[in-house]
């Protein structure tokens, strides 16, 4: 593998399917699809000369993938540093896989659970914290609990980011808005890092900035 990475990171969408319907997540017109293990292996082989840092997320819920273990093993064998973003509804179910093939960082979108009335919050929080404790105890995985400050007021912790304990963090951000060519908002300043610092590969193999 090339020691000098061209991209800081590459996003690889292993599935476009999700088990939640969040109001803040832009609906896709693409058909639900799961990238096969062979397709994923090909992706890793082809991007290996450009980066060693991947995010298993664009749209969709990565923990839904039925062959997640095989995918993480491919990453491990290729010496890829892996981050994944999840709503964590399946984290207890997928815990054995995450223990067998630990990733560098798991980003948990807590606002996803808060946005779906179908979720039993008591069970969700219990399973999440129990799984986090196990991962923190048995692996070096870092866990970032992400919240959106929709009220735009000083947050409870007094800071946007804080460390709860070793490898466990809380990250507070403003709500993310997906780019929309039909939006009436136009910023006069800005710069797109797409194809400069990162790129993404969708589950059907399409490459996007």
Model-identified regions with their sequence ranges:
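Structural recognition of alpha->loop->beta junctions
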Residues: 44, 48-49, 94-115, 157-175
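Well-ordered, non-membrane alpha-helical segments in soluble/globular domains
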Residues: 120-134
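Active-site beta-loop-alpha junctions enriched in small/polar residues
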Residues: 59-61, 87-89, 111-113, 148-150, ...
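Conserved alpha-helical substructure of the radical SAM core
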Residues: 1-105, 117-119
